[in-house]
Amino acid sequence: MEGFPQVDAIKLRGIRIAEIILTNIAAAAWWVFKAINRFIPEGTSFQPAWAAAPLLKSRQKSFPKLGWPRETDSLCPKCVKEIRTKILSGQEDLRLLIDGHPGELKATIREQDGKIMMEKTCPKHGFFSDVMAIDSAFFSRIERLFPGRDLKAITEKLHNHGTSSIQYGRGSVLTVDLTNRCNMMCDPCFMDANQVGYVHELSFEDIQKILDDAITIKPRRQMSVQFSGGEPTLSPLFFDAVAYAKKIGYYCVQAATNGIRFTLEPDFAKKAREAGLRVAYLQFDGVGNKNHMHRKISNLFDVKLRAIQNLYDAGIDVVLVVTIVNTINNHQVGPVIQFAIENADKISFISFQPVSFTGRDEDIDDETRSRQRYTLSHLAHDVKSQTGITEPMRDWFPLSAVGAVSDLTDYLKGPAADWGTMKCGCHPNCGIGSALLVSKKTKKWAPLTQVINIERFFEDARIITDSARGPFWSKVFVALSLLRNYDPTVTPEGFQLTHLLKKFDKQTGGALGGRLGALDNGNRKQDEWLILFIAGMWFQDLFNYDFRRTEMCIIPYATQMGEISFCAYNTGVGWRQIVEKMHMNATTAEWFKEKGRNPIYANKKDLPLPEDAAPLTLKVTTDDWTGAKTGASCQSGGCDSGCGCHN
């Protein structure tokens, strides 16, 4: 037995040598391809069945104005509220939002002392200023890597909201609020849940029409649908909505949830999975109960752990959704990533969302806003300073950068495809992303950019798509690109080239000829190496509103009045308040009288947890949770990976 480790070491060295040889051959072959490619005319674009126009070559794509100084269209925070009040009271007609430009003004984006600022002046309400980035070099990098807009959206009844209309692409995540009721009283809250004085809740007929209408629009791209609220699990139609969305073909059915029902009702997750729920977007503000105290439940972290366990046991993937407020929980960026690494088999994604001062926080004072403002550049620097993971100027990309791979996949699917590939085509100021390779067994990790030159691979994908050499040769060139951009000399121990190829094949829906394993949660759990995505999604508020971002929104809100950009719905001119008020079911008092009150947990006390629940299998590095004090089976301490996160 003593010789086996030596045999394994020799085998691993042999694999590494073979990988180095392969990558060198691929690099040489790629340059041959590029040299020949210059002398052969590009293949022509085709119009797929799912689109209203031919696929775009990279040079045909349009771009918003980027860089600085630049001028854009924005809103006056005070004018907007005045106009919204008049529309809600009947003093102004709703057509003003469609035909006019209420509250709009010009804004300048410029550099000041290494920061990027937005400045605007209203003739009536004066000067407004807010920070867009604390690092102008990082801001410049993210804008430089933007690959261009998607196909033009067709303006029709679902997208007829004046200057708030989405004008490019199809979106990635269709968001549907099932109810504005909630069982918490969070601050911040996009919709000011439980405080508006009325209940807005969709009927099943509403849900069917909204979901049916959404898949008739061209470009007809694959979309996820996310049921939201309020708390969507309070809707009596939650399971029906999930099942219907799955039935008619939505790529991925998700729920944005606080996790309370998944915690208190162990069978709730199983029923949701049976209905077709694939992903839970779980509100998660940090590690330990003290980092959730602003949510007004004293043991909320314990609640989250139980929800994650129940969701995992039911086969539902978990995305941690972290609203970051400067001076409140910005110190939790590192601990949240560490928690996700230690539980990478249960957590597939972290979505950090810098605070948007809207809903319950729309009237924030200037001093508090300045203190609590958090940007995407804050996030990139906090990830490095708190964990040692990633370099801001190397490892972060605009979310839209992956559009190069979506374009390639669209080409490989051919003209007969009924659906286009899901595409994240948002403005570069909207979102950023990075990714880690994490071993499920050892918890060893590495930035994906350490293993593969992602920036160069995206450029290769653009060249392959523009060249249009047919599906067979394009797949050959994709394989060459992956090989030439892979660096076997710096991969974490145990990671091999075959792992990378399988991961790429799954993430692109079988672009290399394999099975679409990304649709199967069980398939992901069988992998030894997992990709943990870390994203920053910064939703706008009235202080930093930019209509160029609204036009390219990838998260359309599907409502009884059509599909509206996420930011135009939740902030902007205030479409949420208008839609909900015009389509409300009843006043809150009338609803309570007829249907009774749903519980609201908001008194800063413990939420009683089920006593007969199975032991938790999550690993937690903190003593600030009930399980650590009661001897429950969660593990505490370091992850023993040498990652440096526990110093």
Predicted regions and their residues:
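Histidine-centered metal-binding segments
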Residues: 627-647
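Short, cysteine/histidine-rich loop/knuckle motifs that typically chelate Zn2+
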Residues: 77-80, 123-124, 181, 188, ...
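Conserved alpha-helical substructure of the radical SAM core
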Residues: 122, 127-129, 133, 143-270
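Radical SAM enzyme [4Fe-4S]-AdoMet core and its adjacent flexible, acidic
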Residues: 2-8, 13-24, 31-51, 313-524
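Radical SAM/AdoMet-radical enzyme domain recognition
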Residues: 208-226, 235-354
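Iron-sulfur (Fe-S) cluster-binding segments and ferredoxin-like electron-carrier domains
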Residues: 83-88, 129-134, 191-201, 570-580, ...
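N-terminal [4Fe-4S]-dependent radical SAM core
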Residues: 45-175
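C-terminal target-recognition/interaction regions appended to catalytic cores
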Residues: 501-629
